[in-house]
Each structure stands twice: as structure tokens, then as C-alpha cells.
Amino acid sequence: MTGAVTIIGGGLAGCEAAWQIAGRGVRVVLREMKPQRYSPAHHLSGLAELVCSNSLRGESLENAVGLLKEELRRAGSLIMAAADATRVPAGGALAVDRELFSSYVTERIEGHPLIELVREEVTELPAEGVLVIASGPLTSDALAERLKQITGDSLYFYDAIAPIVAADSLDSDKVFRASRYGKGDGDDYLNCPLSEEEYERFVDAVLAAEKVPARDFEKVVHFEGCMPVEEMAERGRETLRFGPLKPVGLTDPRTGREPHAVVQLRAENREGTLFNLVGFQTKLTWPEQRRVFRMIPGLESAEFVRLGSMHRNTFINAPTLLEPTFRLKGDPRTFFAGQITGVEGYVESAGSGFLAGINSARLVRGEDPAVPPPVTALGALVAHITTAPARHFQPMNVNYGLFPPLEGKVKKKDRRGRLAERALAELDHWLATV
């Protein structure tokens, strides 16, 4: 294919994609609706606006997001250059001055000779040319209607995220494997049994826990079929026990009896290193989630690799729709990038923009698509987003539970360092080819 690549959306992913495409000698038309029109959450006229926190999270390679940052730095990321140039003191985290950050990105985009910035709302998808859709979690209604034409029923408007825990942080003396009534393979779920006393204490804690207040543009949301656990508890003390915590069809091998209540954990990935709390979508604050959910037997020392949330979020079912290159299956000219792909987080969005950018440029240049090695942070995230079980797909941030295991025995305290070391070595080899 020839000509310019059109990018819809001037957020982190769209700007990163534009930078990578232009850096490979391909023209870009970047279309951003601000300041002609603002979403309910945006206020700055500049590009790459950080809507929520000004933190890009941890810097250490002990955190997978810290590793992803380092990978993007090595890959020549515009977003990471902007973050490093506009950082503010934040301990072990990378936080930025959000206005300076936006200005930095805007100036670089506007100053690049191969990038044309068009500030107007997109309501129709271009019929020709390579396209990167990076319209973000607050995609306008008009554009969302057009996206339905290419995504069908696989376009969602709200997420309902349950917490995810690392399997190796669970207490195996308390948790048992079983499926309700022995269905499936008979041991598909991990089960945390609660006595009546433990259940009552848990309900009390849920009812008393602090909740995240809804933002103005989220207050009309009705979560059909995925009510927050705290709202279920408010309906009555037994509601949870007849809902997600129902014990029927399960026998605690320690007692030989049906527990009073059971919290079920379902595998989040094929390797079985991550498990989500089934039915535990919630709007409790993150500190309260850690405190309250660690009251569940077996989860006392649980490592939460993702905490629960429920908010406005336009995203597609990536396992159904996307190739590992972030190209749309069945439509070789269209790519997706950013939170609309189901990645969660600023850095993850930039990473997806990087990959969609280099692959759309490679398409224009007649080159084969590139997929990062699965042992890298970017590769592990891409592999999860595009191969996770489609039926239960929800947005995901990068975490070490997504990575392929190391070969041989490695002490737990050394594991993350070794994963990071392996990732960066493989990344350097891969970058030399793209």
C-alpha cells in the first residue's frame, strides 16, 4: 500500500503511533477532535492529555510496567521521552506535570515535517488507505456508531473489571480446586471456602468499605448482569451467598461438607499464573479492595496484579478482532491502538501505539509485520490481549503474571529480575530487525 497513514485520536497511543510511522519515513495524518469538541473528561487543548492520574506508575524493573517503560525508551518512544522530560518528584513512580507533558508531545507532533495534524471530529471512517484507530476509552458517540460497522457485537462501552491475583501468592492449604458439580475438567476453579462467621465478617467489611465516587459522565451507567459486589451486599446480607459466593455443588475436601459460602477464582491465562475473583467487579477504592479481599480465606497474602474497577470505557473484544500486530482480522488496512484495544494504563496505551505504528508503517513500505517476542513486556501484553478467552475478556494492564515462565528453578526473590533481564536482551535483538 502507498500514501499516508490516517490516525484517529491524538491521545498517548495515537501520538506514539504517529511518531513511529513518521520516523520510518511514512506520511501521517493525525486527526484529533479537540478543541472543536471535548469529551466529558478532557480539558486541555493539547495532545496526549492525561485524564486521570499524572502518574505513569512504578519505575523499578521489579514492576512489569517499569520494564515496559524501559523497553519503550529503548525503542525511541515519544511518550517516554515526554515523561522523562516533564517528570515531577514521586518517589519510586514516574509522575509528570500533565500540562508540560501535553505541550511537549504537541510541539513534537506539530513540528514533524511528515505529520499533518487535523483538528476536527471524525464521524466517518476513511474508505481508503491505512488506518489506525486510537480514539480512546471515551470515543465519541458518532464515531462509535461507525466502529460498530466493523466490530459488530464486539464493541463495549463500560468495563466491569474483577481483581486478579497471582497464583503463587495464594495459600494452598486453604484453597481447593474444583468445578461446581464437577463440570468441565472437574478442577477448573480455585475455591476459597468461608464459614458462616467468616462470611458475616466479610459482608460487614464490604458494606463499611470506602467506594470510588462516580464521575459526572458515569452516573447514568447501568451495569446489567455485572452489579458491584458492594451493591449486592447492600440488597441484603444473604445476597452474595446466593450470587457469586454461592456454595452449591462444591465440597470442601477438608471438611467433606458444602461450605457456608465460596469465593471462586477463575484462570486468567493459559499458564495458570493469574486468577480473577469471579463476580467481584467493584467500585471499592484500591486500598479498601486490598484490605477487604484479603479477609477471604486463602487470600491473606494475595498479590493483586490488577484491582477491580467499573467505569466508562469504550473497548473492543481484542481476542476476537485483532491479530498480534494490532491489525484488524479480515481488514488488512485497519489497525487499533490504545485503550480501545483492551490494554489498561498510560504506558500500555503508548506501547500499543508503538506496535500499531511500526506495523502500519511496515504495511505501507511493503514489509512484513513485526510482533515483539512474548518474553518482553510488550510482547507478553500483546499475547494476552489477542489470545485471552474472548468470552470473559476485560481490559488488562501489564504484569509479570503474563510472562512465559523462566527455564529451570529460580528463587522467587530473583524471578522478576531474571524476567526483566531476559526481556531486555530479547527486545534488543528484536529492535534491530524493525
UniProtKB/Swiss-Prot annotation:
One Gene Ontology term, aspect cellular component: cytosol
Swiss-Prot/TrEMBL cofactor(s): FAD
Any one Gene Ontology molecular-function term assigned to this protein's record: tRNA (uracil(54)-C5)-methyltransferase activity, 5,10-methylenetetrahydrofolate-dependent
Catalytic activity: uridine(54) in tRNA + (6R)-5,10-methylene-5,6,7,8-tetrahydrofolate + NADH + H(+) = 5-methyluridine(54) in tRNA + (6S)-5,6,7,8-tetrahydrofolate + NAD(+); uridine(54) in tRNA + (6R)-5,10-methylene-5,6,7,8-tetrahydrofolate + NADPH + H(+) = 5-methyluridine(54) in tRNA + (6S)-5,6,7,8-tetrahydrofolate + NADP(+)
GO biological process, one term: tRNA wobble uridine modification
Cytoplasm recorded as keyword: yes
Main location per the UniProt record: cytoplasm
NCBIfam families documented for this protein: gid_trmFO, PRK05335.1
Annotated family: Belongs to the MnmG family. TrmFO subfamily.
Function, in words: Catalyzes the folate-dependent formation of 5-methyl-uridine at position 54 (M-5-U54) in all tRNAs.
Descriptive protein name: Methylenetetrahydrofolate--tRNA-(uracil-5-)-methyltransferase TrmFO
Source species of the chain: Geobacter sulfurreducens (strain ATCC 51573 / DSM 12127 / PCA)
